[in-house]
């Protein structure tokens, strides 16, 4: 592919402008004879996870295609599954710009996007138009102006709307960019949320005559005790899977680099080791009682294999994909 040249041009632009431009072009070629420019053939390597059959174990992590605008394009590149979102009940513009920064020397990104999205109804319309043959995950969150105490209502609204169209639903309680959101990972707040989500899942299962698994996405910045408590809650509430991890607030690996002081969540290579360690600790705690989807800094075949060796059943990429391009999908799926 021509990605090194494309990347050079895109990296001259503001990161958010580069993202918009890329999505414009992907929408332009998808479903036309020009789709060959992005299509890659990858081997089928089926994986069974959460009761679903995945074509291969590599997925696109949430956050890149928040509104489900380019699902078919990412499918054409060879992803076994695509996770869209995070989406909220109502549209919201997110935090003030600039809010996305490349840490080029470290192959990392810092973002404080703040769940900018066009709302769950718009996402559902985009999903209905897509023809992706893989598993579609839909990642849901709460609106910024919804008080944390009422946050679970936002998740239940989104579940209602996405359930008929989702392969699985991801519950995002770990973004550092929505005030108070991470507090939902702890103690009674977590138990209350998970109980409500399982009740809603049961209700929707009966209504739609299909079972859509639910996975919870957690942060990397957790103490041993917090991780043990989260694992215990996930098991007690019969949650179907856990996605580990979201972005980190830790900056120790990027000290002195451009933009290192910017607020927001850090992803990419600087997150690689810490997210793998969370997966390893989580796997020891869970003992196979629910599967782990590993994400955080995967930028090579070896990084993907490390996540799986630590206990992940599936893996996802985002920042590594920005820095390495579609070839990374092929490299991982071919040899994982």
UniProtKB/Swiss-Prot annotation:
Pfam family, one: DHO_dh
Mode of membrane association: Peripheral membrane protein
Gene3D superfamilies per record: Aldolase class I (3.20.20.70)
Keywords from the named record: Cell membrane, Flavoprotein, FMN, Membrane, Oxidoreductase, Pyrimidine biosynthesis
Known catalytic reactions: (S)-dihydroorotate + a quinone = orotate + a quinol
Role this protein plays: Catalyzes the conversion of dihydroorotate to orotate with quinone as electron acceptor.
Listed name of the protein: Dihydroorotate dehydrogenase (quinone)
Organism in which the protein naturally occurs: Serratia proteamaculans (strain 568)
């Amino acid at each position: 592919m021509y990605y090194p040249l494309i990347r050079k041009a895109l990296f001259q632009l503001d990161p958010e402008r580069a993202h918009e431009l890329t999505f414009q072009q992907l929408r332009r070629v998808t479903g036309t004879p020009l789709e060959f420019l992005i299509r890659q053939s990858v081997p089928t390597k089926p994986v069974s996870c959460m009761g679903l059959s995945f074509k291969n174990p590599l997925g696109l992590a949430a956050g890149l295609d928040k509104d489900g605008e380019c699902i078919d394009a990412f499918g054409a590149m060879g992803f076994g599954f695509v996770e869209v979102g995070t989406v909220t009940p109502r549209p919201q513009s997110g935090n003030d710009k600039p809010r996305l920064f490349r840490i080029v020397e470290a192959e990392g990104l810092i973002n404080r996007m703040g769940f900018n999205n066009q709302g769950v109804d718009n996402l559902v319309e985009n999903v209905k138009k897509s023809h992706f043959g893989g598993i579609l995950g839909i990642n849901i969150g709460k609106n910024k102006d919804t008080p944390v105490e009422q946050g679970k209502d936002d998740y239940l609204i989104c579940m209602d709307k996405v359930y008929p169209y989702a392969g699985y639903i991801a519950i995002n309680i770990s973004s550092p960019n929505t005030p108070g959101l991470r507090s939902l990972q702890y103690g009674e707040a977590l138990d209350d949320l998970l109980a409500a989500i399982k009740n809603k899942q049961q209700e929707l299962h009966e209504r739609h005559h299909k079972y859509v698994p639910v996975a919870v996405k957690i942060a990397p910045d957790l103490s041993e005790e917090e991780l043990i408590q989260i694992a215990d809650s996930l098991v007690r509430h019969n949650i179907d899977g856990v996605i580990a991890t979201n972005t980190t607030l830790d900056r120790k690996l990027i000290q002195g680099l451009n933009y290192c002081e910017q607020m927001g969540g850090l992803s990419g290579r600087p997150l690689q080791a810490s997210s793998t360690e969370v997966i390893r600790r989580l796997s020891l705690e869970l003992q196979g009682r629910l599967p782990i989807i590993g994400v955080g800094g995967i930028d090579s075949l070896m990084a993907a294999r490390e996540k799986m060796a630590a206990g992940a059943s599936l893996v996802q990429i985002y920042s590594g994909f920005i820095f390495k391009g579609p070839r990374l999908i092929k490299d991982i799926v071919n040899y994982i």
